[in-house]
């Protein structure tokens, strides 16, 4: 898979922290997020899923993710936003790749991306969360175009 190494800015994010199998929690988290965004007139800059664990090492019921939108620096959580977190994704050096997800198969592009990165002679994966930015509305289009971000450091 083709990818590039680039510097990413810090992102302020608001949304929901979920624990459990990603096949369920990401969908559930985005359903909650859409209701919260619509109900509070939040204007998202980006729609993002943040992944904290390696599914090959962590049991499915303990996998952590955030389903969030990026928000401006001065954003405050509206009243009656139970369960909403406001945090950030660290800026820094990331490997990035764009992929199209069809048939809800988000795992395949991620595995392809990681396999490519593991063969890189100059960079290694850093112990920080990975995330994906949604470039379209997959529920309307029938597929998702995503930009994947994996933190890296020089070898």
From Swiss-Prot:
Q: Name one GO cellular component term.
A: cytoplasm
InterPro entries under this entry? AraC_E-bd, DNA_gyrase_inhibitor, DNA_gyrase_inhibitor_GyrI, GyrI-like, Reg_factor_effector_dom_sf
Give its localization.
Answer: Cytoplasm
**One Gene Ontology MF term:** DNA topoisomerase type II (double strand cut, ATP-hydrolyzing) inhibitor activity
The record's section on SMART domains has: AraC_E_bind (SM00871)
In terms of one coarse class, where is the protein primarily found? Answer: cytoplasm
Alphabetically sorted, this entry's keywords are: Cytoplasm, Stress response
Q: Provide an example Pfam family for this protein.
A: GyrI-like
Report the sequence similarity comment from the record: Belongs to the DNA gyrase inhibitor family.
Which NCBIfam families does the annotation name? PRK10016.1 (NF007451)
Q: Output this protein's name.
A: DNA gyrase inhibitor
Q: Which gene encodes it?
A: sbmC
């Amino acid at each position: 898979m083709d990818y590039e190494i680039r510097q990413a800015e810090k992102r302020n994010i608001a949304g929901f922290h979920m624990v459990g199998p990603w096949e369920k929690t990401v969908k559930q988290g985005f359903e909650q997020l859409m209701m919260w965004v619509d109900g509070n007139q939040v204007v998202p800059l980006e729609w993002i899923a943040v992944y904290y664990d390696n599914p090959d090492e962590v049991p499915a019921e303990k996998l952590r993710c955030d389903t969030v939108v990026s928000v401006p620096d001065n954003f405050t959580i509206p009243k009656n936003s139970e369960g909403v977190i406001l945090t950030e994704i660290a800026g820094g050096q990331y490997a990035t790749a764009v992929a199209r997800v069809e048939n809800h198969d988000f795992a395949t592009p991620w595995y392809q991306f990681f396999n490519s990165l593991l063969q890189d002679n100059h960079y290694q994966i850093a112990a920080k969360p990975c995330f994906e930015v949604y470039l379209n509305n997959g529920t309307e289009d029938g597929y998702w175009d995503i930009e994947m971000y994996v933190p890296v450091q020089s070898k």
